[in-house]
Amino acid sequence: MIDNIYVFDDIIEKPYQELIKETLIGGDGSQTVDNIDEDFPWYYTSDVTDNSHEGPFKGRWGFGHEYVTAEEGVISNFHNLFLGLIKNSCKKLKIKKVDVLQGRSFLSTPTNIPRDDVDTPHYDMDAPHFVMLYYVNDSDGDTIIYNEKTKFDSCYANDEMKFTLKKQVSPKQGRVVLFDGIHWHTAQQSNHNIRCILNYDLRDLSRVTQGVRI
């Protein structure tokens, strides 16, 4: 698993950035890449940090779209749009093979929630993985990654847990953050702009004989 937090700006070329942004939040249906011939659908979620686990979530509602699930594999044609992004991100880490465990996007609208009132600390799934977090647009609502690590026994934090800041990253179009999914993490709510991200959970298969070559 990766041993640091990596932030790369312009991980993909600007036309590719614009295509992703247009597809997810442009909404005019003018996409031209293969398998992208429909308007992008968003689905309401009652909490953007709730990964279908019971827990004391704060009710930060938003919209989501799943591309890949651990149970069913690829469930959205839009997944193909992000393969180049995944490939470029893995190249930065010199990872040659990955298994895509989970992939989704989230969209949240501006709120008046104070910046220090962050979303529920969480981790994405109960299995070793690393996180690829890509910012679709410029926004506020920083990503917060903590020093504390999970034992993969509960996907949500409780009131007795204490967290210390490891890294804070601001959303910027074309920026990607890569980190070990064992770290608890969360985000601030946006106050001034819509916040749109891609969140993929990947497993490094570089040292095994089977996997998806990228």
PLM regions and their residue ranges:
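Catalytic core of non-heme Fe(II) oxygenases with the double-stranded beta-helix
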Residues: 79, 83, 87-214
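Non-heme Fe(II)/2-oxoglutarate
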Residues: 1-97
